[in-house]
């Protein structure tokens, strides 16, 4: 069983890396990488890149502070430093195995501060749900404000927006809902047939309790402030890189917001740090705003690579700090 699980996990990781690699290969198959070296040495303003770093760090710190806030109402007390370092490390490990970071940070709090894993995971689910809703809201607003750009995008990619929307109907939604309910009922029935049912039930209860913690957050406005801080910092971390390159310095905040949102949605595809899907989505939108193909390819490759290196550096820092951190019981692990 363990071998089978290891094989399945290895296949998932391999397929994820292959998918990202294939997209990048297709995008850069005829690309002259000498232009990247020339841009790095002579064609970009590194001052703006360095100025973007504090916002990348601050975004993860805000996430750590917010997580610490959501754990308090459910009786779980984690050290703020552990919460932040767990966030740093979770992003780094997700570069290897996409989406594993959510579980990793819960495991870190369990190991160092004795926090309940299911409850911690519940708060993570709650955070992700809120973040997803916020991104979708911003995406809808951006979509309507920049509708002409998105229409051009669908035309350029050979996709007709009207044909996509016409496929959705009341009957279609009803059938989808019925199928989803049927699957849930079947899953519930099958779980009851196995001994693992009680464990799964307890896990779900813990997750639900974590989700409900949003209702009992002691400082709701602080939670909102942290959430805004997270996404404002992520955006500034990205937006300031526009000023590093002559081809993007003049594009303005509207273009930055559109490409930021499109890139944020693209990373839903499970590849390491969104490599591949993010490059394609952002590069395509930049071209629609008038950026040349070579300049757009340079931009996405350099920005993504540098920001990934920052994630790695923060992960190494967190791992080092945690290596010298004692558990609440006074044991160094």
Which residue ranges define each predicted feature?
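Interfacial segments of multi-pass membrane proteins
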Residues: 109-116, 210, 280-298
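Extended non-transmembrane interhelical loops and adjacent amphipathic helices
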Residues: 72, 85-114
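Transmembrane alpha-helix interface/packing and boundary motifs in multi-pass membrane proteins
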Residues: 89-98, 258-279
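Membrane-interface alpha-helices at helix entry/exit sites of multi-pass transporters
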Residues: 80-83, 102, 115-127, 136, ...
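Predominantly cytoplasmic-facing regulatory/coupling regions of multi-pass membrane proteins
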Residues: 1-88, 145, 151-267, 306-333
């Amino acid at each position: 069983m363990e071998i089978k699980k290891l094989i399945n996990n290895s296949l998932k990781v391999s397929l994820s890396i292959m998918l990202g690699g294939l997209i990048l290969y297709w995008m850069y198959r005829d690309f002259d990488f000498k232009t990247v070296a020339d841009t790095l040495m002579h064609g970009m303003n590194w001052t703006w890149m360095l100025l973007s770093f504090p916002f990348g760090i601050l975004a993860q710190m805000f996430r750590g502070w917010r997580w610490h806030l959501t754990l308090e109402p459910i009786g779980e007390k984690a050290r703020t430093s552990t919460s932040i370092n767990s966030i740093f490390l979770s992003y780094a490990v997700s570069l290897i195995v996409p989406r594993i970071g959510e579980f990793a940070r819960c495991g870190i709090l369990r190991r160092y501060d004795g926090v309940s894993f299911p409850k911690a995971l519940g708060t993570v689910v709650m955070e992700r749900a809120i973040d997803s809703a916020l991104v979708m809201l911003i995406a809808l607003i951006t979509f309507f404000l920049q509708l002409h750009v998105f229409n051009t995008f669908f035309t350029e990619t050979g996709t007709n927006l009207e044909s996509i929307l016409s496929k959705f109907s009341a009957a279609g939604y009803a059938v989808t809902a019925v199928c989803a309910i049927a699957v849930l009922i079947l899953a519930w029935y099958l779980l009851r047939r196995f001994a693992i049912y009680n464990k799964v039930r307890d896990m779900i209860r813990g997750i639900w309790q974590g989700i409900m913690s949003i209702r009992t957050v002691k400082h709701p406005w602080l939670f909102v402030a942290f959430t805004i801080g997270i996404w404002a910092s992520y955006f500034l971390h990205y937006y300031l890189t526009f000023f590093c390159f002559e081809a993007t310095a003049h594009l303005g905040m509207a273009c930055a917001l559109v490409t930021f949102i499109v890139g944020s949605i693209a990373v839903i595809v499970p590849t390491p740090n969104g490599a591949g899907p993010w490059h394609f989505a952002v590069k395509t939108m930049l071209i629609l705003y008038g950026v040349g193909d070579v300049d757009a390819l340079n931009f996405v490759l350099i920005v993504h690579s540098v920001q990934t290196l920052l994630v790695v550096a923060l992960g190494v820092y967190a791992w080092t700090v945690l290596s010298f951190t004692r558990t609440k019981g006074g044991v160094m692990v």
